[in-house]
Amino acid sequence: MAERLQQVKSQIPTGLDPQLGPIATGLGEIFMYTIDADPKARKADGTPYTATDLRTLQDWVIRPQLRNVPGVTEVNTIGGFQRQVHITPDPARLRALGFTLEDVAEAVEANNQNVGAGYIERNGQQFLVRIPGQVANLEEIGNIVLARREGVPIHVHDVAEVKDGPELRSGAATQNGHEVVMGTVVMLIGANSRDVAQAAAARLQQAQRSLPEGVTVTASYDRTALVDRTIATVARNLVEGALLVIVVLFLLLGNFRAALITAAVIPLAMLFTLTGMARGGISANLMSLGALDFGLIVDGAVIIIENCLRRFGERQHALGRDMTRQERFQETASATAEVIRPSLFGLGIITAVYLPIFALSGVEGKMFHPMAITVVLALTGAMVLALTFVPAAIALFLGGRVQEKENRLMAWVRRRYEPLLAFSLRRGRWMVAGALVLVVGCGLLATRLGSEFVPNLDEGDVAMHAMRIPGTSLTQSIDMQKHIENRLVQFPEVSKVFSKIGTPEVASDPMPPSVADTFIMMKPRKDWPDPRKPRATLLGELEAAVEQLPGNNYEFTQPIQMRTNELISGVRADVAVMLFGDDLETLLAVGRRIAAVAGKVPGAADVRVEETSGLPLLTVTPDRTALAGYGLNPGQVQSTVATAVGGQVAGQLFEGDRRFDIVVRLPEALRQDPAALADLPVSLESALSGGDADESSRAASGTNGARTVPLRELATLANSEGPNQINRENGKRRIVITANVRDRDLGGFVGELQQTIGREVQVPNGYWIEYGGSFEQLISASRRLAIVVPLTLVIIFALLFWAFGSIKDAAIVFSGVPLALTGGVLALAARGIPLSISAGVGFIALSGVAVLNGLVMISFVRSLREGGLPLAQAVRDGALGRLRPVLMTALVASLGFVPMAFNVGAGSEVQRPLATVVIGGIVSSTLLTLLVLPVLYRWLHRRDASPA
């Protein structure tokens, strides 16, 4: 990038200096802080601290310390004023003495330099030759000689005032209704946001000790808080899920030591997982740990332990005594061998179905790859433990008498299941027909669920985009922003409100002075008057409060969501309608019609058209005829006006390691006065030296013999209106209409919006519409999933065929997948959750889970038939014999997801669709396994009723 930038510099207009921004992503703003002073605090000279003083402390005390924090690539500053030394000439004195602003700037720059002149050697020593010429204070600047008139030196202080002054700033910061200085810590791309934010907060506390008494620096926004809340949610889900799994194991196994062995797989598998994550550089966060289910992790161990307990009981009954140690070892090996193949294949299938998730790319790939890696690591660890630790632990620790009969709970379940199984086998056709109807019905229902990319994460805080009419001054915007903050901070749920207005020092996020980003930081819910108040209700109250303040338009979103939307589509809203064409007026007219139509679509909020016009301008138009008469060119007029209004840097003043620009410009009162600008003296030196000035022109204006000419003789000054901004995309002009979506799924909203605009808005020839926003990622991911999901199903069937060596049996077990998916669809519909990528990942995971129980049952039925049992009896005994492992694996797998499905903590929104799909799917899959799968097996093998 730097190399390409150097190549195009020659094509960029003079005065523009392109620079690379921070090496960071759009989500790199992880930590913000404010510098403020107690109104009673005083400096050493007894004066109060000003905004310039606070900015100086930020630039030269705080910022250098924070930039040394590992992982920080930039500390961006907004607010206050950079200190400058202002030389403000009096135009009347300049005209009287024949000087221009450029003359003053050139004289100061020429008298403010240090020069090195090599070195000399004397007496064996080397002396560097140094010629100091820099000014040390304001007095020395004032004493710089501009020229001599009749032997009398003319100093800078003779024509100008020299004093400290503020910069012409392009941005400001406010907090709780008053101005502050704000710093933003930008994280280096690839760094860990939590680590960097914590290190920045610690360094900020150290920086506080180096500040004067009465000046405080406080954190305003720390992403660590959100990260910690989401990690706490994940940790709580995992702990609660583990406890539920362990309770179920105790209840259904009826053996304390067996349950402990199974439960021991959880920490061992987690150790395996965390080791792999550490080696792979994957951090523990909401996405990486969000799909971990301890129920799935112990499924393989459950199958092995349950079969060992059953075999131990049968062997004890046959022997009439407890088994010896050697007999127990032999029985463990035999029982494990009996089920190790289906259990390993089951875990292998669950693991394999996560592999196609790696085919996701873009934003969805970044989000879900860590999740897939973590689950694959956990299940791989579980398979290793099922092969090694579990059989060894059973053989060693399950000594003594093992209960031969089922516990009361399982006996009660068996009594209820036997008549249901008998009914299912008698009414096999009806059961299969009912399953088919359910699959078709849920397929139709899925098309009505709506869709979104991923559920919005409730960050806890609110970001508000406040916009005024183009041309609103920074001073006016600050006043309006103070009123907004004073109104918002009165809410008892609000902790503080701070804003960034306009563009900061490093223009990584440029905004005009009429626009502000407002961050509304909320108190913890426990401190709210009503902790159960819905977020949507509070958002409506905030919106109603600020709508009462005139002159503003608002967009409400969240801090991270705002940046994510910008990264995805270039706008901060959920949906962007981009209109492309040539003429700005036509674009604006059609854009307003689109906005009017979009506002009528249910779910639309904060609909607005990008402001492209209405920027007030003071235009100085050079008169080329007059310029030619004086032998001047437009560049000299442009240079004079630029120096007078914008200022010209004429060197720097050094105070220790601090340096401040010396700027030549008009006094503030004259800068604001067009009449004073018209009287600016423009130098005629170049024309006089060239000798090509038109004497008649000079005589007509009374400037014969003069060294300068007033600007009014060379140009006209007039107020006008120009475009506020001209945006292009792929080389074509475009205007954007944005909208947020409230209380509706994103996919359904965009679909209706497209239909409504296509029906009600006539787009002129040569103009066209494109749609942008986070739904683009939904479309991209959906297209990828349309390939990934069939591939997943093919992998499942291939593994089943490998396990059984029979297409029939593989098809029987595979039939569990569609019925499991129906349960997921019904669960989403019951909870009002739209389809999303999170739900899609849940369906992928469910495809693997759905075949596990069928694999175990069909394997047992096949072994019974191989043992000589007739088909009907083998099917019945196989279903009853595998009732406990089927229920156990289903219960532990689903209960492990229950905390994710019903938790309301930070980040639970992302986990909820995935968990809901898996729980609903496991319920329907279990019903299939216990009632429909025996029917399918008997029906497909009816022509081969003899033992296999």
What do the predicted segments below correspond to?
Residues 1-242, 252, 321, 366, ...:
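Membrane-proximal extracytoplasmic
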Residues 16, 279, 294-309, 340-359, ...:
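Transmembrane alpha-helices and their membrane-interface boundaries in multi-pass membrane transporters
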Residues 168, 223, 227, 260, ...:
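C-terminal transmembrane helical bundles of large multi-pass transporters
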Residues 220, 227, 231, 305, ...:
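Helix-loop junctions and hydrophobic alpha-helical segments within the transmembrane domains
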Residues 313-334, 363-369, 388-439, 470-472, ...:
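Interfacial helix-loop-helix hairpins and adjacent transmembrane helices
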Residues 337-339, 405-455, 489, 495, ...:
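Signature of alpha-helical transmembrane segments and their immediate interfacial
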